[in-house]
Amino acid sequence: MSNEENKVNEEAVVEEQVEAVGTEADVEWNESAEDSQEAKIAELEAALLASQAQIKEQQDTVLRAKAEEQNVRRRAEEDVDKARKYALKKFAGELLPVLDNLERALENGDKENEAAKALLEGVELTLQTFVSTVEKFGLTVINPMGEAFNPELHQAIGMQASPDHESNTVMIVMQKGYTLNDQVLRPAMVMVAQ
């Protein structure tokens, strides 16, 4: 072999070694770059998961707050409705003796006396107007004559045997009862058939 051929062979070997060294360095550099990219990807994925969990938690908090707000609003509306419905309860209770007295005046008035007749007509008109006015505000008369006894609406003063009435039926109403918006203000006082 000649010197020139040796030099060419040596140069080829050196180039191969340089390429081999370069390739190993490139591989190490590529591996470290890949490792750092994988670490960065893992870090970003962890941050994404944490952010998604935080978003879900905040959405849950917002939903709970909205539900609580709706519950508070609903309760407040119910309280206002109850206050409106039953604000008149005490006032209506005080009006019941007036209704009773107007009815007694009609029952006990002398209908044969001409002078008292006009007065009784006035009392009857007053009673009708008064009853229709209080009915507009939810006051309802309980007059259970001939109905089955209901302890929620009636107060039994006594029981009496009666062949004309079925057992456990109201045969005499001693005092009418009243409800205000479906709540018993005063039960009707009744005599019940045995």
From Swiss-Prot:
SUPFAM superfamilies per the UniProt record, alphabetical: Coiled-coil domain of nucleotide exchange factor GrpE, Head domain of nucleotide exchange factor GrpE
UniProt keyword annotation of Chaperone present: yes
InterPro entries: GrpE, GrpE_coiled_coil, GrpE_head
Gene3D superfamilies: 3.90.20.20, Head domain of nucleotide exchange factor GrpE
UniProt KW keywords: Chaperone, Cytoplasm, Stress response
Disulfide bonds: none
GO molecular function: adenyl-nucleotide exchange factor activity; protein homodimerization activity; protein-folding chaperone binding; unfolded protein binding
Principal localisation: cytoplasm
GO biological process: protein folding
Compartments, as annotated in UniProt: Cytoplasm
CDD domains: GrpE (cd00446)
Annotated GO CC locations: cytosol
Pfam families with a match to the protein in the record: GrpE
Alphabetical list of PROSITE patterns matching this protein: GRPE
Family statement drawn from the similarity comment of this UniProt entry: Belongs to the GrpE family.
Primary role: Participates actively in the response to hyperosmotic and heat shock by preventing the aggregation of stress-denatured proteins, in association with DnaK and GrpE. It is the nucleotide exchange factor for DnaK and may function as a thermosensor. Unfolded proteins bind initially to DnaJ; upon interaction with the DnaJ-bound protein, DnaK hydrolyzes its bound ATP, resulting in the formation of a stable complex. GrpE releases ADP from DnaK; ATP binding to DnaK triggers the release of the substrate protein, thus completing the reaction cycle.
The protein's assembly and partners: Homodimer.
Protein's UniProt name: Protein GrpE
Gene (UniProt): grpE
